Amino acid sequence: MTRCLFVSDLHGQLERYEKLLAAAAAERPDALFLGGDLLPLGAPPLPGGGSDFLLDWLGPRLEDLRERLGPAYPRVFAIFGNDDPRAEEVSLAELETRGLLVHAHGRRLQLGSFSIYGYACVPPTPFALKDWERYDVSRFVDPGCVSPEEGYRSVPVPDGETKWGTIAGDLVALAGADDLSRAVFLFHSPPYRTRLDRAALDDREVDKVPLDVHVGSIAIRRFVEERQPLVTLHGHVHEAARLSSSWQDRIGATVCLSAAHDGPELALVRFDLEAPEAATRELL
């Protein structure tokens, strides 16, 4: 058995993190996956002082968990999401240096006999922060969304990357010719036209053009269809599970799971990599 916990879109909400840490302490999973949008929106003051959520709040609590669990401390795989400023990678790197987690974006990592891949970027959104946004399969931008070449970034990137980079190209480079039959992909974006990317855009128009209610990545969808990894993990679209009545889907043989949730609770997904189709989700 390779027991895993998965959460996403916690947005720095301390109560959700406390519930997650309590579950990890009680259940002693082999791995914990953090699927992006980890940081507080607007960075409110932290209890007890400090302004860096990762270093001043999360880091000490992960250290406490490691001290409590000892050798049973889980492998923690983390990516950022589109609401997380890339400038905070410095703090995430510091937590990795301390051995508390691994920043998985753009990397292939190992968990026993399983390969773990992380990818944080999402297709263009209506929001201004573009650190983790890419064109999807082309330079097309849905009505109402803002191009990755516009908006703002907390960390500068080369103009060519902004203009020509795509999720499709990134995934080809990330996976190469690897055998993905025992691979887990930790994404922030869900795949397009699934139960996991259904947004509350019904009857909405921009300049009389109806908006697509599916806002996931076409590139991720095609990648999963073609390469068939064992499991894909997703977040980003908080309301999807409520609107589609499901937090999981399948693309061929690939099990696709989402931990996004639009209520106040923590959505905690539990799964075993030896039987991911038996995954469960609990609202805590």
What would you call each of these model-derived segments?
Residues L14-L111, A259:
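Core catalytic region of metal-dependent phosphoesterases/phosphodiesterases
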Residues S8, L39-W57, P126-F140:
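Acidic/histidine-rich helix-loop elements
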Residues H11-E15, L39-A43, A78-V90, L109-Q110, ...:
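Active-site environment of divalent metal-dependent phosphoester hydrolases
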Residues R108-G112, K208-L211, I218-E226, E239-L284:
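Binuclear metal-dependent phosphoesterase catalytic core
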Residues S51-P60, V206-I218:
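A short acidic, glycine-rich active-site loop
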